[in-house]
Amino acid sequence: MVSAMWDTSALKLRNIFEEEFGGYLEKRLRESIQLNRPTKRYLKLATRSDIDLKFHKVGKKESNGSSLVKYIIEFDTTAILVKGYIRPWNNPEWKCKAPYNSNQNVDTRSLYKEKIIVRDNVKDLFSAALTKLDLSVRLNKFDQNVHAKYRLNEDFLQPLGRTLRHSCEFPVMHSRLVQRESELYEEFLSYDLPKRQMTTMDIQFKTVKVQSFQQYKIQYIQTLTREKTSQEYTSSARLPHWQSNQIQNSSIKFLKLCCEDEDFHPLELYKLENPKADQFQRKAVYRSKPIKPKWRISDEIIKRLNWNPFKELNLPKNSELLESLRDVQVRCTSYALVFKRIPSSKIDLMVSKIPVSFRSVNAISYDQFDPKSKENVQESSQCIDSLANEETTDVDEVTNKRIMTSGKRSFINADLVSIIAAKRSKLKRLSISNGDVNPVATLNETVEQSTMSNVTFQLSDKSFHNAEEKVIIFNAEYIAKNYKLINFLHQNNFCVLEMDLGDHSDILLDASTCLILRNITSVYQKQVDSFPLLRAIQELKCKYKRVVIFLSYSERSLALDSNLAYKTQLLLNCLGGTTTHLVEETQLKLTATWISLYCGTNTPNEQQIYRMSLSKEVLQHFDINPIAIESILSLTSLEEFLSISYGKRALLYGKFLTEYQLAHIDDFVTMSWSE
């Protein structure tokens, strides 16, 4: 709204004009008036001129012909500006007792009681005016020099009756209560859980806070209309209770029971018995005899019917028609119980400082070993020499050296002791035939030695010859802990990447293998009722098919407990499916060698791993590692990967994905969308 204000600071008006023109002179009113160009030009000329401007009152029916006057009359205003001089009328002056000083400041708000001496002709004028009851005097008839107290107020005998001409209608405010009552809250909750859901998950439903109106009834129940009385009623509304007297007909009850019988015949429904007269409690109506039963068929048919139609009927029962019994020979076969074999972890033997080369001893069953069997010694020795000199990436074929003193075998059970004893005899025969160092003799010689032997390994410089082709991904969360190993791998030209894997693993070796680097003392750290390291390994087994654990130790820890390494191995064997290696803390080259042996050469490069796409983001939600994602997308597309069946997906991509990941993907694909 555009507002303007009349500037009347240059005008010298009396207080009487302030009462007549309201708030125009006090600058209290703001109006927006649309004027045409001639009127704007005329108003601008009138305000900038030096002439005296005067206000005069214009009635609704009067019009001076000016465009400004005509315009303001249309908008129902009470004052206009007129350019020009107005000649004052020569009105008779009132004579007062004391001379009036025009320079004296007189308060017009005070009331004066004075007597006015008038002549006889003036009295006649007043008497004639009183008969007409109209003493209205125009303001412009009097001179400005005449004081206001001698003037007669305009229309003082008639009520003005001023009302607001331009009323503003404000919109009615919307009731907040009515608006909230009209809103409906609809919620849908699924009644089933996803497949293969973990039972240990705590499911909590958040309550939806809806503002309730305790003093108002949303669903109002209309009661019966009552006459208006002065009695006060409670606000509780009760539903009317209609009492119904059910007629107990014995014949109908009998027919209902007969319908449940399998031998019931439909002809019984043709004959119905009317209720007795005493069951109807009517006023002044009594029946002496009950109503005779009537057939619901015509009389002609009744004559031809046999009155005892059920006497000669020999209908079979429903059970005889629908069911038949025969002897069937059933042979119950008992199925053999098959227990799933849990793969155990490997047992690593600690070796002495003397370099000894033989294969790592794996956990095998006692039934598979025959101590009386004889093998060709020459072929076995050649096989061991070839394994020691051949370069391979399979960790089971890598040669290493271990030592195991008698004090550190105290926890091993009887079956495992017999297996190790047979293995010793076999290695003894091999060492005698080849003339090499006998590991059993070495073990027997070190029984009386100190148990604080250093763990040494025979390393090969050929382990790093393909370092440029191997990509090792470190977890960005544990970079501060593994910075020494990262620097060592950088110096040997390995491609080292850093990514946030979102799990407890330290290194991602390939598409299905992860590596954990921990101290041996962290295995026995306990929180509340669980071991943090064991819980982390269980979580990693859901994401990776193979979990490799490197436990670093120091000579001081072995000096405190000689059986610490084997106790740790026994505890980790309970998990199953893990491979544990004991490495000395200072052996960075040894750790790098094992990491190089576990890494494959067909891993994607740095650009392929860091390049993100929509398909990779979808597969990341199923807890799949980056190398496995690249391997899957290199073989097929995302649409084809999700559209195939569960068995085909497990057959084609089972080497990258675990059973938990396959089940998670299958739950997502077979999910039902409810409205």
Swiss-Prot record:
Keywords: Cell cycle, Chromosomal rearrangement, Chromosome, Chromosome partition, DNA-binding, Meiosis, Nucleotide-binding, Nucleus. GO terms for cellular component: chromosome; nucleus. GO terms for molecular function: DNA binding; nucleotide binding. It comes from the Eukaryota. It is found in: Nucleus; Chromosome. The keyword Nucleus applies. GO terms for biological process: chromosome segregation; meiotic cell cycle. Belongs to the ZIP2 family. Required for initiation of meiotic chromosome synapsis. Involved in synaptonemal complex formation, a structure that tethers a pair of homologous chromosomes along their lengths and plays a central role in recombination and homolog segregation during meiosis. This is Protein ZIP2.
